[in-house]
Amino acid sequence: MQTEHVILLNAQGVPTGTLEKYAAHTADTLLHLAFSSWLFNAKGQLLVTRRALSKKAWPGVWTNSVCGHPQLGESNEDAVIRRCRYELGVEITPPESIYPDFRYRATDPNGIVENEVCPVFAARTTSALQINDDEVMDYQWCDLADVLHGIDATPWAFSPWMVMQAANSEARKLLSAFAQHN
């Protein structure tokens, strides 16, 4: 895969430039555009993934299915499709917006900061997973209710963005509705 970049944003969310992805994530990460996706199977189960230990931020942490950064000229939806192919080896249904105005800042235990405007999407797949070990070290298909209960009971066991997304009542309601429509 070619070198990825992030689209830098000002405080109003207007693009101001780009920066190489690895260089962008530091202790002083600038605000940039990202996306987060929750992927469901035909049974309505959520794919929860564990980030590879080689990841710069939050290595080994359990999180939602796929996250990434749209590239210049690429829609968020196309970026979700691209990253699902790259990380999971799957084709998906057109991504549906779940939490379009999600924005967060969090610092991992190593001091790496995520600072993102990060619209959240949900999609489905019926494909068999072909996991990219550079991105994902483990995964599990789970009932959404069990995952949400786990997040509520042990938020420290999940990525901060997943916890924050699940804490939004409207996003939680939309994810639950999405999971039930098999």
Curated annotation (Swiss-Prot):
Molecular function in Gene Ontology: isopentenyl-diphosphate delta-isomerase activity; metal ion binding
Pathway in which this enzyme or protein is active: Isoprenoid biosynthesis; dimethylallyl diphosphate biosynthesis; dimethylallyl diphosphate from isopentenyl diphosphate: step 1/1
A GO CC term assigned to this protein in UniProt: cytoplasm
Positions annotated as active site in the UniProt record: 67, 116
Domain of life per record: Bacteria
The keyword Acyltransferase belongs to this UniProt entry's keyword annotation: no
The EC number(s) this enzyme carries: 5.3.3.2
Cofactor annotation: Mg(2+); Mn(2+)
SUBUNIT field: Homodimer.
Name the record gives this protein: Isopentenyl-diphosphate Delta-isomerase
Species whose genome carries this gene: Escherichia coli (strain SMS-3-5 / SECEC)
Name of the gene encoding the protein in the UniProt record: idi
